[in-house]
């Protein structure tokens, strides 16, 4: 089953009839318009390309304008692709709404996490700090040793060090679908999702549901 592209509106909470508070993230899922259908014969795989939202005319490049015009859809804020499963069929120009998730219980949400800039190992990797006193004067938050000896004589790939934190693609799996509001194009999922308010999200039926 394909997914949909939405926009993170923010977080709130809703109450059950028993008075239990559920923290939810509100995702606005405007109609996803199909701009291209890829098939085995021409592309080597089956998929659909979709767009959503709107883009100012002066921000649309000529190649983009031609692509959207050929599909007969309004220019959107980006292009995303979803692989098609056996038996799934879509046509160019078709509109897909949030009702796609009407019978879905859990979803996986992918977004770009908030960037935190250059961060040290304590913040980035939860390293323990070294002694505050006991003769330690300069190495309270340094990572410590990063290798061994003349053998192997190098720092291994993947060593946890200071560096850019956040601003990367993150997927949160198996979030409960609390409500699907087709009238207002809203999807409410339990818990937090990656990214800042207003950022794009890819919502798919959960792999591990």
Curated annotation (Swiss-Prot):
State the family it belongs to: Belongs to the universal ribosomal protein uL3 family.
Q: What is this protein called?
A: Large ribosomal subunit protein uL3
Q: GO molecular function, one example? A: rRNA binding
UniProt entry tagged with the keyword Cell membrane: no
Q: Which residues carry this modification: N6-succinyllysine?
A: 38
Q: Single GO cellular component annotation? A: cytoplasm
Q: What keywords sit in the KW lines?
A: Methylation, Ribonucleoprotein, Ribosomal protein, RNA-binding, rRNA-binding
Q: Determine the domain of life of the protein's source.
A: Bacteria
Q: Which organism is it from?
A: Escherichia coli (strain K12)
Q: Which residues carry this modification: N5-methylglutamine?
A: 150
Q: Which PANTHER family match?
A: 50S RIBOSOMAL PROTEIN L3, LARGE RIBOSOMAL SUBUNIT PROTEIN UL3C
According to its UniProt record, how is this protein modified after translation? Methylated by PrmB.
Stored Gene3D superfamilies: 3.30.160.810, Translation factors
What Pfam families does UniProt report for this protein, alphabetically?
Ribosomal_L3 (PF00297)
* Gene Ontology BP term (one): ribosomal large subunit assembly
Which purpose does this protein serve, as stated in its record?
Answer: One of two assembly initiator proteins, it binds directly near the 3'-end of the 23S rRNA, where it nucleates assembly of the 50S subunit.
- InterPro entries this protein is in? Ribosomal_uL3 (IPR000597), Ribosomal_uL3_bac/org-type (IPR019927), Ribosomal_uL3_CS (IPR019926), Transl_B-barrel_sf (IPR009000)
Subunit text: Part of the 50S ribosomal subunit. Forms a cluster with proteins L14 and L19. In pull-down experiments interacts with CedA.
| Keyword Aminoacyl-tRNA synthetase belongs to the record | no
């Amino acid at each position: 089953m394909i997914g949909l592209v939405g926009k993170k509106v923010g977080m709130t909470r809703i109450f059950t009839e028993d008075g239990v508070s559920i923290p939810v993230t509100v995702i606005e899922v405007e109609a996803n318009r199909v701009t291209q259908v890829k098939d085995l014969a021409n592309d080597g795989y089956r998929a659909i390309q979709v767009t959503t939202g709107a883009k100012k005319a002066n921000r649309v490049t000529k190649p983009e304008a031609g692509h959207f015009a050929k599909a007969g859809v309004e220019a959107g804020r980006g292009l995303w692709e979803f692989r098609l499963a056996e038996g799934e069929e879509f046509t160019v120009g078709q509109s897909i709404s949030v009702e796609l998730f009407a019978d879905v219980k859990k979803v996986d949400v992918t977004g770009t996490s908030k960037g935190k800039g250059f961060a040290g190992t304590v913040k980035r990797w939860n390293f323990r700090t070294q002694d505050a006193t006991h003769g330690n004067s300069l190495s309270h938050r340094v990572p410590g040793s990063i290798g061994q000896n003349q053998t192997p004589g190098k720092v291994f790939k993947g060593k946890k060090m200071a560096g850019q934190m956040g601003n990367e693609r993150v997927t949160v799996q198996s979030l409960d679908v609390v409500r699907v509001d087709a009238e207002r194009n809203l999807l409410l999922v339990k818990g937090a999702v990656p990214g800042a308010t207003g950022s794009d999200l890819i919502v798919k039926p959960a792999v591990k549901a």
